[in-house]
Every structure is written in structure tokens, then in C-alpha cells.
Amino acid sequence: KHVYVEKPMSHDVFEGRVAVAAQKKYGVVIQHGTQQRSNAGRAGLHDQIKAGKWGRLKISYGYCCKPRGSIGHKKFGEVPAHLDWDLWKGPAVIEKFHGNYVHYNWHWFWATGNGDLNNQGTHELDVARWAIDDDQTHPVRAMAIGGRFQWKDQGETPNTLFGMAEYPNGQQVFFNVRNVNYNGYKRQVENQYYFEDGGKIIGNQYYAKGSDKGEKIDFGQGKVTPGGNWGSFVAACRAGDPSMANGDVNDAHYGCVLGHLMNNSYRLGEEVPFNLKAGKFGDNKDAAEHFGKLHDIMGKGVGVPEKDNYYTVGPWLNFDPQKETHTGDFAKDANQLLKDPNNKGFEVPTIDKV
């Protein structure tokens, strides 16, 4: 059957790889629920970026900064009579039931979700990766720094995160998650583009290096299958043509893996004092600058004091884009995160069994 799959397509790297193999074997349409892929204007902008209209793209930056709130604490207890708990869990291995595992808060536990990075952030991660050169699939290394600040609740995933990834050609993706609310909060769910000559695109404005005066740009119209995400999916199914999907299985996989790798780094991180020196950015001045902006918001806006607060700083994780495995330092532990353990009876099949 053809499949329209909501984001994120996968909960781990292995699941995505299996989906790619299944699509290749059966030749069906698989369309990801990343609606920006049906936006002809966004496609047109990316065509111009790749053609070098503003010079070479250096950093493609995604933001998932939307206010959320504490989920509190739910006690472990009996499964409600109306809930088929085993079916609800599916492949996820969860020993005991509590109310925060069921809709919607399952997003904030590693067994069932990926945090906002690969929840809402899947949309902006996909756009960020879409803008870099077409021959780039997976990054060769990634890291993340963040934490779960202020709420002191039951959730496990970070509500604040700065992640970055480097691709084989040197292009980078930066990503910012910020969910903690505060007075004057700026909701920021968008993408920005930074070029090697110092220029940048924010919104529909291009800013030359050193200028605070933007020039409105015409995104143009790129090639997409008409009808929006639903209409294009139906058209692709009727035509029996997987290439008509706006956001096919490969793009879904590459975009989700980008988030998984940042999350893997975070999950292997260690606590360091909450200050500007927390990041492991080496000589990457761009990363230090953008992390500094996030830290400033968390300190001055949210009001997180430096004393007795900590960032979780993940290591740089190397990744082989062809083999889809971690290499080098931390590889043993990181590779354990590429495939989740599965609940009996709901095992994700291996590639040879799809």
C-alpha cells in the first residue's frame, strides 16, 4: 500500500533505513508529513540558493522555538480499562504505565518520542537540510548542548537545545529548540540561511554582510507536485509514481536522521556549569556566536541563574553516511542508540524481512 506518514517518519536511524528499503522493494509512494515540501516558494528559494545567487551557503539554520509547559508528574499505576496498553506502546519498551506516556506527552520520553527536535522541529530540520547541496545525504558529525530547564517535571527530553551538524562538503546545519516560556517570549519557528561572504537571509529579506537593512527577495516558484501535501500524495498514488511525492522516503530519512544524531549526542552528554563556556565548538566562531544568543535568552530572558544550573553537553559524534553507523570516539555507545529495543510482538523487521 501507499503510505502517508506523519513526521517524524522514524524513531531511530534503523527504522528509517527499513522504510527506505521497503519503499525500494515495493515501489510504493511514501510521502512524509513535512508540509513545506509542497511549498513552491520555498522550493524556488532553495533553487536560487543552490544556484549560488547569494554566494555559497555556509549554514542552514532551523528554529523550533515555541512555548510549551511543564507536564508535572504522573504516578505509576494501573492501565485504564479503555486503553489497549500493549497496542499503544507498539515497539516501545516501557515497563510501567503512567499518565504522561499517553497523548500528547509521550513526545518527551526517549522510549516513545524524540523531544521537540524531532517533533515540531522535524519540519525545520527538513527545510534546513533541503537547502544544502543536493548530493549531501547524512552529516559526517554532529553534536548538541542543552537541558530541561525550569520545569522540574517528569519529562526526559531537552526543552532547550542547540545542535549542529557538518556535512562532507563542509556545509553546516544549526538547530535551536527553545520551549521554556517567559515574558516577552519570541515565538520563532522558521529557517534562516547564512552565506560564506557574511550575507544572510532572514524571513523574506537578504542582508549583506554588516548591513542591518534588508532587501526583499522574490522566492520564485520551484517545482513541486500541486495540491499541497494531501493532494500531491493522492496524485502520486493515482499515477503510481513515487517521484511525485513532495518529501519522499529518502528526504524523510535524511531529515529525521539529522535530528537523531543531535539527540544521540545529547543523550551521551555530561553536565557542565551553565555558562557561555559550556559549548565544545573549537574554532567554530559561528557556533559560539549562535549558542551565545541562546544562552543570553536563557539567562536574561528565562531567568536561569548560573549557580546550581547545568547544561548537558554532548560529544562530537562521527558518522559514516554510507554505512549509517557512528565511528571513532564514542562509537560503541552511540551505535547502541541507532536502534531501539523493541516490545515483543511489535518488532521492527530487519531489511531482509520487509
Task: Identify the role of each PLM range.
Residues 21-28, 44-58, 76-79:
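Basic phosphate/pyrophosphate-binding loop/patch that engages nucleotide-derived ligands
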Residues 86-171, 180-185, 250-254:
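Rossmann-like dinucleotide-binding domain that binds NAD(P)(H)
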Residues 56-59, 96-98, 135-144, 172-176, ...:
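Acidic/polar loop patches that form or flank catalytic/metal-binding clefts of enzymes
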Residues 237-354:
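C-terminal helix-rich "cap/oligomerization" subdomain common to oxidoreductases
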Residues 95-105, 226-237:
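Active-site-adjacent bridging/hinge elements
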Residues 61-101, 339:
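Core domains of carbohydrate- and sulfate-ester-processing enzymes
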Residues 1-38, 314:
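Beta-strand-loop-alpha-helix segment that lines the small-molecule cofactor/substrate pocket
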Residues 153-155, 161-229, 248:
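NAD(P)-dinucleotide binding in Rossmann-like oxidoreductases
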